[in-house]
């Protein structure tokens, strides 16, 4: 039997800092909302695994360090098993792009980085 994990609305927010390599690979780091420690990743698939781990660990309380404006913000509204639903936003823009799965999130990130 699979464990069911739900994240209440607004509980998981990540600031993403991305860089596209000459070979097309996207790497970077993210900063969980309630943590002062950035997490680096070498691919989008690794990013997903590390974000999943970050949502399973209680976050530290305290102030978020002042850093540069992120490329994107990912808000996970619902999470059940390995399925995420949420919003991908660019800072400074009011509206975001909704996603209903991790695959949709990755597709949105890839298409936004191609621009």
Show where each model-derived region lies.
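Intrinsic disorder/low-complexity detector
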Residues: 1-14, 22-24, 49-82, 115
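Short, low-complexity cationic-aromatic patches
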Residues: 7-12, 19-23, 38-45, 80, ...
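Canonical SH2 domain fold
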Residues: 15-18, 27-32, 74-76, 84-90
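Mixed-charge, glycine-accented linear interaction segment located at domain edges/termini
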Residues: 30, 35-39, 50, 88-115
């Amino acid at each position: 039997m699979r464990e069911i994990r739900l994240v209440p609305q607004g509980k998981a927010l990540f600031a993403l800092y991305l860089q596209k390599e000459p070979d097309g690979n996207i790497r970077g780091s993210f900063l969980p909302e309630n943590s002062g420690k950035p997490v680096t990743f070498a691919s989008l698939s690794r990013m997903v695994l590390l974000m999943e781990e970050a949502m399973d660990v209680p976050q530290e309380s305290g102030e978020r360090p002042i850093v540069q404006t992120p490329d994107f913000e990912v808000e996970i509204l619902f999470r059940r098993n390995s399925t995420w639903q949420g919003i991908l936003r660019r800072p400074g823009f009011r509206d975001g792009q909704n996603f209903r799965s991790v695959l949709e999130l990755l597709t949105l990130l890839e298409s936004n980085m191609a621009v």
